[in-house]
């Protein structure tokens, strides 16, 4: 059994390699890593601020020296050591506080797209929390313009299509829910790339049903429902997300494995789970990789997608997460291609876009196996 020795050092500047390097490299053949590196992909659960690379975090911290976020890479590695989920949220919010101008927003967004493109991610639904920026004084119109400018540049220059999920920061209460809903549904502000509406932050003490009126408004405005649920609480939170918030996909859903009826429900209705294995270890939502419920999900026939969540903070990226999945599920190239196509199916791309990306995955896999 593989265990993460405390303290977990999930930050990308981790000395001696990333968390997933330590866990996966000895057990996954190098040619499979090479296959993963070139595999065309879609990513559905990746956070905007949580994707800030150590270089960008250091640059932003230097721009805003009143922040407590360190600029030194060694100190940043220590800073990105999380004791539990609550501590992760505390650190995450301190990085959010570095995003103070529209220029910061555009820089971050484009650099996130650049990193996705490096991993052959053709399409990504990036979770953005506009409330966290507008409450810090960024003009809401300027914020929308910044993410849209970066989105268009990324598609033209990098070949990566970005779409947005606006999420409610649950720890900020119903005020944030109202503001996020307004920004997501006001046609004068709503960005062209917005496709979905979510709910993040702590689950404990933040019951999902209280957000039903806001999700109802977002769904009525044509947005898809993709709340986090069952990451740090039990399967009842997933049921609430489904029954009260109209969830079409579940962010994490880790505890779903504890409820056979829920697994059956997810499988029969083809409701995808956005699985983020390394994140679950780093935040202590799951004790060890060997105990991760991804195996139970696939055995039950649940549509599983692989995602990186907050990759630099957890010392991972999407390629590493596919390697984790290969190790846990004993997958070969065709199995990994199947996971990539799961993400395409579960995405909110138009049918033509889904068909193109699925065909590209098939062509890449066939070419690889024939070589």
Q: Model-flagged regions — what are they?
A:
Residues 3-5, 14-223, 232-237, 244-249, ...:
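Metal-cofactor-binding active-site regions of metalloenzymes
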Residues 10-12:
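Targeting/processing segments of secretory and organellar proteins
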């Amino acid at each position: 059994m593989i265990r993460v020795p405390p303290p977990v050092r999930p930050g990308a500047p981790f000395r001696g390699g990333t968390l997933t390097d330590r866990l996966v490299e000895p057990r996954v053949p190098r040619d499979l890593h090479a296959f993963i590196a070139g595999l065309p992909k879609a990513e559905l659960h990746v956070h905007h601020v949580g994707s800030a690379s150590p270089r960008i975090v250091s640059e932003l911290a230097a721009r805003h020296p009143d922040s407590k976020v360190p600029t030194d890479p060694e100190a940043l590695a220590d800073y990105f050591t999380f004791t539990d989920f609550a501590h992760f949220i505390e650190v995450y919010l301190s990085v959010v506080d570095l995003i103070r101008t529209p220029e910061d927003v555009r820089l971050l967004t484009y650099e996130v797209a650049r990193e996705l493109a490096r991993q052959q991610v053709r399409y990504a639904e990036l979770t953005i929390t506009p409330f966290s920026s507008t409450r810090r004084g960024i003009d809401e119109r300027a914020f929308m313009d910044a993410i849209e400018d970066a989105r268009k540049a990324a598609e033209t220059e990098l070949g990566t299509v970005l779409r947005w999920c606006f999420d409610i920061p649950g720890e900020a209460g119903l005020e944030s829910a109202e503001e996020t809903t307004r920004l997501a549904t006001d046609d004068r502000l709503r960005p062209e790339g917005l496709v979905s509406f979510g709910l993040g932050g702590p689950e404990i003490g933040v019951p999902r049903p209280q957000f039903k009126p806001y999700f109802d408004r977002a769904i009525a405005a044509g947005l898809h429902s993709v709340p986090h649920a069952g990451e740090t609480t039990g399967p009842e939170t997933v049921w609430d997300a489904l029954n009260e918030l109209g969830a079409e996909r579940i962010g994490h859903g880790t505890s779903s494995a504890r409820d056979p009826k829920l697994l059956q429900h997810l499988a029969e209705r083809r409701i995808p789970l956005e699985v983020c294995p390394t994140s679950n270890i780093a935040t202590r939502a799951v004790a060890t990789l060997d105990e991760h419920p991804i195996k139970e999900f696939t055995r039950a026939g649940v549509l599983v997608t692989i995602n990186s969540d907050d990759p630099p903070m957890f010392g991972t990226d999407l390629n590493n997460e596919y390697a984790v999945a290969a190790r846990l599920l004993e997958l070969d190239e065709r199995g990994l291609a199947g996971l990539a196509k799961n993400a395409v199916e579960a995405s909110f791309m138009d049918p033509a876009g889904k068909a193109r990306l699925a065909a590209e995955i098939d062509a890449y896999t066939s070419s690889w196996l024939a070589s």
